[in-house]
Amino acid sequence: MRFALELLAIVVFFVVYKLDGIYSATAALIIMVLLNVFYHWFKHRHVPSMMWITLILVMLFGGATLIFHDPLFIKWKPSILQWVLASGFLASHLIGKRVLVARMLDNQISMPSLHWRRLNAAWVLFLLFSGALNLYVAYTFSEEIWVSFKLFGLMGLTILFLIGQAFYMSRHGSEVRVEERKEGMIEAEETVENRPE
């Protein structure tokens, strides 16, 4: 549901751009992201940190586009977001016992640490590349082409990358069974209960 709402925001941006230009599209994007955050809060009483980051960047760069009447700000937003995410994946690669992608998915898939680290590194490279590619398109081609690339290009690349990730995980990982999850939770509870005071 969350992915569908995020995709809807991009689609609305694209449609409004075709109807009334970049500034109306930017305003529509800000509204859609705000609505997504409000919806998630009222439904779950919690907003993931990724949604907060997206909201802050959209407000900053979208707001700057509207205030200064310069579309270059909103064109930078996807790249900044990708590079912020890349920094998070990279930091987890250097600090801590588990990389970020393992923390996100190891309750569903069991894989050796080496493969989690490779997958995490792949995310870093992909996010850095897609951020750079966004700026290349923004500065090299027309605004209309960039808007189309934002919807079809970046989204298409992300879907292809996720397919590749799923293929890699299917080769090197195994699905975590419900019984194993329950056993892990029971063991954790017993450890807490039996710890010395």
UniProtKB/Swiss-Prot annotation:
Cellular component GO terms, alphabetical: plasma membrane
Membrane topology of the entry: Multi-pass membrane protein
Function: Plays a role in cell envelope biogenesis, maintenance of cell envelope integrity and membrane homeostasis.
InterPro entries given in the database record: YciB (IPR006008)
HAMAP family: YciB (MF_00189)
Subcellular localization, as worded in the UniProt entry: Cell inner membrane
Keywords attached to this entry: Cell inner membrane, Cell membrane, Membrane, Transmembrane, Transmembrane helix
Name by which UniProt lists this protein: Inner membrane-spanning protein YciB
Superkingdom to which the source organism belongs: Bacteria
TM helices/strands, residue ranges: 22-42, 48-68, 76-96, 121-141, 144-164
Similarity-based family: Belongs to the YciB family.
Pfam families in the record: IspA
Species name: Magnetococcus marinus (strain ATCC BAA-1437 / JCM 17883 / MC-1)
